[in-house]
Structure formats: structure tokens, C-alpha cells
């Protein structure tokens, strides 16, 4: 079951836009398997985007390509094996600064059933130049991506 938190009564203006999307789900797969789906580009590209390219180390560039959304460049911010994977991403041709990118953080925790509690936090929408529209788009996108990773793990 996934939980999702975003103030539903927020007025979407540049002054009051929520800064963060947060989603958590319980997956019936061990942390090692979920970690691989998040951090190995070939696996990540299988469920998240059309292709994914990176070297798994802090500071490494990443590149995600989407058939209908183009290229999303980024940089890996944190790699804490089996625990946390974070990257900053934005739009092709724009700098990866606070006005043009957001921070995506995945955390993994083993649960009592041998599965994984997976949490995603994407932050930085309040300072994003197109924050109001981007938080709406990404909120829907993360719903779809959580379904996609669950399906990928169930079948792979």
C-alpha cells in the first residue's frame, strides 16, 4: 500500500507551492532486489524510462530518456548501498540548479516480512521556475512509477 502526502488544499502559486512529493510503499521483495532495480541503469530503464545511463558513484552524471518527454539529465548526489540513492535531475539544456532541477531521494528499509519499505522524496518545487505545473506532473508520474516498479519486481 502506498501513502502519498501533498497538501490538497494548497493554492498553486509561486509563493505557496508545496516543495515536496513523498511516497512510501511496502514491497514484498528483499532490499537487495529493490536496490538493484533502483541503481542498475539497465534495470531502472526497464521500469522507469526508455533508457537510463550512469556510473553508480556520487558526482556522476546521469541521463534518462523518455519517448514522450525527451531527455532528463542529472547528477548522482548520494549512494549509500542498500539504504539510500539520490540524484538531482532537470530538463535538457538547463542547469542543474535550484531554479531548474529537483532532488529525488530513494530510501530503502527492510521490513519485518523480509520485504522492503521504499520511500521516495522529491524536493525543490518551491524554487523551481515551473514549480506549479511540475509538481502536478511529477505527482502523477510517481503514482505511475510506483506501480511500474512493483510490476517490474513481481515479474523480474
What are these regions (language model features)?
Residues 1-22:
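Short acidic N-proximal helix/loop "leader" segments that mark the beginning
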Residues 2-8, 124-156:
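A conserved amphipathic terminal alpha-helix motif
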Residues 15-19, 68, 96-100, 134:
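A generic structural micro-feature
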Residues 18-24, 31, 61, 71, ...:
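Intrinsic-disorder/low-complexity, polar/charged segments enriched in Ser/Thr/Lys/Arg/Asp/Glu/Gln
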Residues 22-23, 42-75:
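Short beta-edge strand/loop motif at the mouth of beta-sheet-based domains
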Residues 37-38, 79:
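Conserved catalytic core of Hanks-type protein kinase domains
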Residues 53-55, 69-115, 123:
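Hydrophobic-ligand binding "helix-grip"
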Amino acid at each position: 500500500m502506498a501513502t502519498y502526502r501533498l497538501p490538497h488544499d494548497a493554492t498553486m502559486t509561486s509563493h505557496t507551492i508545496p516543495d515536496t512529493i513523498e511516497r512510501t510503499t511496502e514491497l514484498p521483495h528483499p532490499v537487495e532486489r529493490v536496490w538493484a532495480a533502483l541503481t542498475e541503469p539497465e534495470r531502472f530503464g526497464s521500469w522507469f524510462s526508455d533508457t537510463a545511463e550512469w556510473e553508480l558513484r556520487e558526482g556522476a552524471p546521469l541521463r534518462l530518456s523518455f519517448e514522450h518527454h525527451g531527455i532528463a539529465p542529472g547528477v548522482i548526489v548520494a549512494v549509500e548501498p542498500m539504504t539510500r540513492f539520490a540524484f538531482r535531475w532537470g530538463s535538457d539544456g538547463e542547469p542543474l540548479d535550484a531554479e531548474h532541477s529537483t532532488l529525488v531521494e530513494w530510501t530503502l528499509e527492510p521490513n519485518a516480512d523480509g520485504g522492503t519499505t521504499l520511500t521516495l522524496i522529491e524536493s525543490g518545487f518551491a524554487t523551481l521556475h515551473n514549480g506549479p505545473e511540475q509538481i502536478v506532473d511529477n505527482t502523477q508520474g510517481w503514482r505511475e512509477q510506483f506501480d511500474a516498479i512493483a510490476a517490474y519486481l513481481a515479474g523480474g
